[in-house]
Every structure is written in C-alpha cells, then in structure tokens.
Amino acid sequence: MAEEQAQPQLALERIYVKDMSLEVPGAGVFTKEWNPELDINLSSNAEKLDDDHYQVVLTVSVTAKNAEEAAFIAEVHQAGIFLLKDIPEDQIGQILGAYCPNVLFPYAREVISDIVTRGSFPQLLLAPVNFDQAYAQSQQQVDAEGNA
C-alpha cells in the first residue's frame, strides 16, 4: 500500500502587535494648517521558530512633516506566528515574503490609523500594498546581482 502524500498546511496561529510607537516632536505643529508630506516605509522579516512555525514581523513606519516641521513618527511591528507544514521548500520564500505580509498588513494599517488619531491628528489610512509584486521585484534584483 502506497503512503499518502502529506497535505500542505498553512495557517495563521497568532497575530499580535510586537511593538508600536508614536512620537510627536513638537506641539507647534498643531498651530499650523495641516498639509502633511508623508514618508512611508515597509519591511518584513521572518524567523523560523521550530520545524513548522515561523514568526513574520511586518514593520510599517510613517513620518509626517508639516510646513517642513516634523509632525509625527508612527511605527508598528505587526507580528504573526504562521504554521507551514509540509510546504514545498521552493514555496516557503514566497509565502514568508509575500503571503504573510499581505495577511499582516490590514492589522498594521489599523494600528497606524489608531495611534495617529489618538495623537489628535487626522485619520491616516494607508493604501493597500501589493506584496506579491514587491517580493517578485526583490527576487529579480537578487537574481540580477547573482548574475553580475
């Protein structure tokens, strides 16, 4: 009797805010008309916890300047524990680099919006991000550097 092929399993087992902060360097920003310039940075990293579990942390940083003055710096490290069991090795990078950040982003977006409004600034809703495209571009860059 032939052994059954194990079915791949992919699941989010836990989601949590690993770290978050809001810095408002000066109160003078509240006395000026609000017309901010935003600088948004995203990054993610993955850490293998055991044979089947990975922690993926999506970091979202937003720096707002208003009239050339720093208004706020908001940052969240949104984390998730993911089960990846019997996943083909060639698919793990794509899952950790694109799928998991796609899952985490709406939660990080909500935290950023919440802490910014709690700082008495207007609501900030970050636009959706195509992590699949970003991952593909990063892989192309790695491949190009490897061939150089």
UniProtKB/Swiss-Prot annotation:
Keywords: Chaperone, Cytoplasm, Protein transport, Translocation, Transport. GO terms for cellular component: cytoplasm. SUPFAM superfamilies: SecB-like. It comes from the Bacteria. The keyword Protein transport applies. InterPro entries: SecB, SecB-like_sf. Gene3D superfamilies: SecB-like. One of its GO terms (molecular function) is unfolded protein binding. Belongs to the SecB family. One of the proteins required for the normal export of preproteins out of the cell cytoplasm. It is a molecular chaperone that binds to a subset of precursor proteins, maintaining them in a translocation-competent state. It also specifically binds to its receptor SecA. Homotetramer, a dimer of dimers. One homotetramer interacts with 1 SecA dimer. This is Protein-export protein SecB. It comes from Psychrobacter arcticus (strain DSM 17307 / VKM B-2377 / 273-4).
